[in-house]
Regions:
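Membrane-interface amphipathic segments in extracytoplasmic regions
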Residues: 2-309
């Protein structure tokens, strides 16, 4: 369970979100859309960080967005000697590995010195929200039957996730607990203390597409070199990112085709997914072509300019 904290930063992104929530807007060739039912961005719930102080790196773990890769990578950078002694690998999961790094306070908690150092680099892997939901659904609902009492009923899952988030965002209970499924399904904007400033972060788009994976692996390699990671280790990390698979990876699952089809074609499921993840598509540079036409045409920059007036 994760402790929820309601903290809305004073960034323009947050002002944008409040603007959306408080009004209705028109979209060309579409009916007027009410935003009151949409899940708000920038609600922070116990964000998870990993550090490599020697290289002045902070990584944020976002569930179902290469979180195991993030942990394995940062464990290696935190203490390479221990990583090798523990026989860890980039294919490790929570269930298959004993990682010494996760017992280290300094690994899990960035120091104030590290946070304020102008040379510290923060990075996070981000993933298309609809694809991220499919990964969650296959892993937690289909394979493990952990999604409420829904089983593999996707309509049931999206409705219950939405209702949970709606209650959470409107709660004034500072000690409210966010559940296991909600933690994995939470909008990207709810992670990493993004309300304190997205501009602080290097965001690496990562999914199952080879082109996307190659591009982000190259960007990460550049970051690591800049932060003083030796060349041979950078090459090892780069290779592992391109080839490693974790035990609970779902992008080659036999059930994925049907899950993706339902996300594309079922209006009930799509309706809830838009309500949950619209702000992720407005705030981050995800490809909006997966959205319904009306939502593709929303000009987030225009609304940001109006709020800033």
């Amino acid at each position: 369970m994760h402790k929820l904290t309601h903290r809305f930063g004073l960034t323009l992104f947050v002002l944008l979100s409040l603007y959306f929530v408080s009004r209705r807007f028109n979209v060309d060739n579409a009916e007027e859309i009410s935003t009151k039912a949409f899940i708000k961005p920038f609600i922070s719930y116990a964000p998870s960080f990993f550090t490599a102080p020697d290289n002045k790196l902070i990584a944020c773990e976002i569930s179902k967005s290469m979180s195991q890769l993030t942990l394995n990578l940062m464990c290696l950078l935190y203490n390479e000697t221990q990583y090798l002694a523990d026989n860890n690998s980039f294919s490790d999961t929570w269930a298959t590995s004993n990682r010494s790094c996760t017992k280290e306070f300094n690994f899990l908690n960035p120091s104030e010195v590290l946070k304020i150092d102008k040379n510290t680099v923060r990075f996070a892997f981000v993933r298309d929200p609809f694809r991220r939901f499919v990964s969650l659904y296959l892993n937690k609902c289909v394979n493990k039957n952990e999604c409420y009492d829904c089983g593999s009923d996707m309509r049931c899952v999206v409705e219950k996730i939405y209702n949970s988030f709606y209650d959470i965002q409107n709660s004034r209970n500072e000690t409210l607990k966010i559940g296991h499924i909600e933690a994995h399904a939470a909008p990207v904007t709810w992670n990493c203390n993004f309300h304190q400033g997205i501009e602080k972060w290097e965001l690496l788009a990562m999914g199952s597409d080879t082109e996307e994976r190659v591009s982000s692996a190259a960007r990460l390699a550049d970051i690591l070199r800049k932060q003083g990671v030796r060349g041979s280790l950078v090459e090892k990390i780069h290779k592992n990112i391109l080839t490693a698979e974790t035990a609970h990876s779902t992008h080659k699952s036999s059930n994925r085709y049907e899950a993706e089809r339902q996300v594309r074609e079922d209006p009930f499921v799509r309706g809830y997914l838009h309500k949950i993840y619209l702000f992720d598509y407005l705030v981050f540079p995800f490809d909006r072509r997966v959205l319904d036409t009306a939502y593709q045409k929303i000009d987030s920059k225009l609304f940001l300019e109006e709020v800033a007036k």
